[in-house]
């Protein structure tokens, strides 16, 4: 009898956790829907041209991951970024402030942001947008393997024909090129695919 009660208790805990996660997901969906309807998130363009602009410097914005393990993998995967055609390209990197000492790419401009996992809007978003909107980006890349609303919202407010991110429940709303690593679970493969896109 005790085992049955323990089993029921465990099942009820799993059920409560499942309901909590469902409510959290539903809340996030409503927030994205509301922000889209009110213009606080811009709708993704449906048309896509896979050729970057010719003859002009290519402007590329790369948002590095907000969690440290993914950030370290991304830094390693992109260590050779810009070694070819560096004169033609202008890179801007967005990096979390607490990773400043870990970031060693020697090309482009770096912008450092403050962020906590509870933030749904980036701290200092207005100033960041003012600075970034001075550029017309050919491609914007979000290297966060897990969905981050604050980053996706920022990207939605910037102009670019190509927006690259990892596939998630919400990625259709924000990215017109999506990388799915759900089967392999190896984010470095996704980073290599992005490197290939940037090398074209």
Which residue ranges define each predicted feature?
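Conserved nucleotide-cofactor-binding alpha/beta core module
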Residues: 82-86, 90-131
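Active-site-proximal region of nucleotide-activated glycan assembly enzymes
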Residues: 14-29, 170-200
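Histidine-anchored nucleotide/phosphate-binding helix
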Residues: 62-63, 67-86
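Short N-terminal or domain-adjacent regulatory/targeting segments
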Residues: 24-59, 69-71
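Structural motif
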Residues: 63-67, 95-97, 143-145
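Short, charged/polar "capping" segments at the starts of alpha-helices
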Residues: 69-71, 98-104, 173
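N-terminal amphipathic/basic-hydrophobic helices that include classical n-h-c signal peptides
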Residues: 1-19
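Active-site and donor-binding regions of nucleotide-sugar-utilizing enzymes
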Residues: 115-180
């Amino acid at each position: 009898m005790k085992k049955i009660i323990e089993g029921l208790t465990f099942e009820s805990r799993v059920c409560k956790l499942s309901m909590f996660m469902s409510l959290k997901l539903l809340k996030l969906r409503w927030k994205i829907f509301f922000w889209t309807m009110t213009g606080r998130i811009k709708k993704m363009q449906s048309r896509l041209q896979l050729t970057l602009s010719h003859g002009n410097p290519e402007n590329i914005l790369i948002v590095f991951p907000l969690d440290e393990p993914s950030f370290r993998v991304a830094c390693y995967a992109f260590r050779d970024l810009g070694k070819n055609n560096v004169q033609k390209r202008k890179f801007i990197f967005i990096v979390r402030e607490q990773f400043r000492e870990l970031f060693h790419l020697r090309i482009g401009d770096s912008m450092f942001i403050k962020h906590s996992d509870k933030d749904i809007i980036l701290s200092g978003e207005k100033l960041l947008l003012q600075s970034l909107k001075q550029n017309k980006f050919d491609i914007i890349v979000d290297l966060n393997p897990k969905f981050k609303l604050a980053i996706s919202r920022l990207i939605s407010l910037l102009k670019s024909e190509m927006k690259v991110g990892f596939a998630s429940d919400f990625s259709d709303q924000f990215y017109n090129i999506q990388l799915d690593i759900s089967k392999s679970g190896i984010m470095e493969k996704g980073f290599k695919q992005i490197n290939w896109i940037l090398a074209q």
